[in-house]
Amino acid sequence: IYEGSGWSVVKTGGGEYYVSSSYVKKADSVQNQGASANQDVSQTQKQDSAGGPGGETGSEAVQAASPQQIGLDGSLPYAGFSKINSGKAVLYKSTAQNRKNKTVAVNAGHGTSGGSIVKTQCHPDGSPKVTGGTTASGAAMAVAVSGGMTFADGTAEAKVTLQMAKILKDRLLAEGYDVLMIRDGEDVQLDNIARSVLANRYADCHIALHWDSTSNDKGCFYMSVPSNASYRAMEPVASHWQDHNRLGEALVGGLRDAGNKIFSGGSMEMDLTQTSYSTVPSVDIELG
């Protein structure tokens, strides 16, 4: 096991998996540290089998035999604003006895090769961004999918978000939820608009996973819908922004109750492409 930057790399089943250090119980000595950590990871990892977090073996117990690949239908609302959309999301059906008949879109942030050199419209109505971020306030066009940040040890954010997305997928399937994996591998050719449109059509809510800090554990928070009046009056934001914020508050509340560090008040206002095009409860959650 390697520990640093507020999270750890657990080696198991021939692979390496990134886990928040808060889930790993420290061993009494360096000699037994790796074994102890593998015994004391969170209940999430305990439910996985030897394949490790997000591995195929751990998933098979709760997934349907034939996951369904789903591409973007250009006739869907807002699909015409997408510039990168040749990739496919993957829909997993839960086989748990307590099926909820609800689908959660799990969006592993970043991971679109070439996404940083393509621009898409920030808002459906062409208005400029009202907050800063990857794209500056006042811009009408944004990067289709940014490359994300790099952790202090050189690991790309996209790699870590995918590992966490697979862990979340397995937990949701075990709890009876179907899961639309927006990105199920290292690269998916779906820009942020395409990801939102797919979630709008095939899911009941949309959760995008990200990290925001590099050298320390900043804490968890979600990107809330800006309080700017003109932004909140724009569709589809006007009809859905309260649902977006409620979902974010619920997720941060759950993370807080589980003992995770929360940054500031748990939210930060941000004008995102994701929520600008979302018609289901949708949130970008930063996990540290």
Cite the ranges covered by each PLM segment.
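SH3/SH3-like beta-barrel superfamily modules
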Residues: 1-23
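Catalytic-site microenvironment of enzymes
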Residues: 24, 28-288
